[in-house]
Amino acid sequence: IFSFGGIPEYADTFGVQHANILISISQISETFCILLIPFFLGRFGIKRVMLIAMLAWVFRFGFFALGNPGSGVWLFGLSMLVYGVAFDFFNVSGSLFVDKETDISIRSSAQGLFMMMTNGLGATIGTLSAQAVINRFVYALPETASGQEVIAGWNTCWYIFAAYALVVAALFAIFFKYKHVVKDECGR
């Protein structure tokens, strides 16, 4: 968001001048959404909760692609709001699922594997892949009157990231087999 400050059209907009407020919306959303996890898991089950998270990533990236810190700042705001669902519903719910479904004798190993696959290996592959996309589609525009270099092409990257998240969600919906049993008010 801060990089838009080099573009005269956006330099004095709310989104650029108050980017920290937008970023704080993500933190507030994450704090609130973590409280929703028990309800959503009980009501919809792990498969639907994980799909909701994956679709939230699609929307988050799509909102970034469509938004800007000027007239499209509301799309940035929506992106920040869905972050809590995207992050918490995937990471926290996934961890709770692993904890619930594994035998106590291998639970810590299963949790370690889940963390390594999502935040270790998965994050590394994701970062390298995202960098390849960025290197391909983001480019520098001629310097502005103030002498600042401005970059462009981010919209394409965000659309690619959204499409990738959508493909992952579709594959998860097809291949993840788990039958959720809705419990009554007494937890039975």
Regions found by a protein language model. Give the residues of each.
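Loop-to-transmembrane helix entry/capping segments in MFS-fold secondary transporters
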Residues: 16-17, 102-115
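Helix-to-loop junctions at the C-terminal end of transmembrane segments
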Residues: 32-46, 134
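C-terminal ends and interior cores of transmembrane alpha-helices
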Residues: 56-69
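A membrane-interface helix-boundary motif in multi-pass transporters
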Residues: 132-165
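Multi-pass alpha-helical transporter architecture, strongest
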Residues: 154-188
